[in-house]
Amino acid sequence: MFSNVGWGEVLVLLIVALFLIGPERLPGLIKEVRAMLLAVRNAISQAKEQIDGELGEDFREFSKPLQELNSVRQMGAKGFITKTLLDGDDSFLTSFNETKQDVKDTVDTVRKPNLRESLKADKTKKSAQPQPSLASGSADNGGIAVTQQSNAGESRSSHDSPVADAAEQLTGDVGSASEPKEKPSAPGYGWEDVT
């Protein structure tokens, strides 16, 4: 009730009371106020004891479900499932935790954590050596060599890609149409389809 009243405010109240009431009656008034506050405190404690005596058992029975609800609220989803479905036996969930950890370990080994840093490191290592064939664009235009991409786990080699195989076949066919693979020495070669 008086928790936010400071000592300065109490001093101001005493000075005002001293002027209003007078110095002769102030000590008697302080004793009366003190006795009144003690009487109120005793009345409140007696009322609490009487209510606890009459309604104590009923109140405790009523508060048990509320306490269970609070405990369920605090335990979280895993604890709630364990308590309700598995009767508190969480040994069933440990196999899921092991499987989850195995999957996480597998994913971590497959995934490279710092792909860009590994590409930059590979690029600086390879810059001293001759550049391999580029997959798309040149190194100046931001292209990344196929070997660098495959080292980073980003791309496959050109022999595994059906698109690259088809492109190679098309470019190979165009080259064979313009120039024969071998030049025959026999006269009349190449005139078979003209008749």
From Swiss-Prot:
It is a single-pass membrane protein. Residues 127-139, 146-155 have a biased composition (Polar residues). The keyword GTP-binding does not apply. The keyword Iron-sulfur does not apply. The chain crosses the membrane at residues 2-22. GO terms for cellular component: TAT protein transport complex. It is found in: Cell membrane. Residues 103-125 have a biased composition (Basic and acidic residues). One of its GO terms (biological process) is protein transport by the Tat complex. Keywords: Cell membrane, Membrane, Protein transport, Translocation, Transmembrane, Transmembrane helix, Transport. Residues 103-195 are annotated as: Disordered. It comes from the Bacteria. One of its GO terms (molecular function) is protein transmembrane transporter activity. The Tat system comprises two distinct complexes: a TatABC complex, containing multiple copies of TatA, TatB and TatC subunits, and a separate TatA complex, containing only TatA subunits. Substrates initially bind to the TatABC complex, which probably triggers association of the separate TatA complex to form the active translocon. Belongs to the TatB family. This is Sec-independent protein translocase protein TatB. It comes from Corynebacterium jeikeium (strain K411). The lineage of its organism: Bacteria, Bacillati, Actinomycetota, Actinomycetes, Mycobacteriales. The gene is tatB.
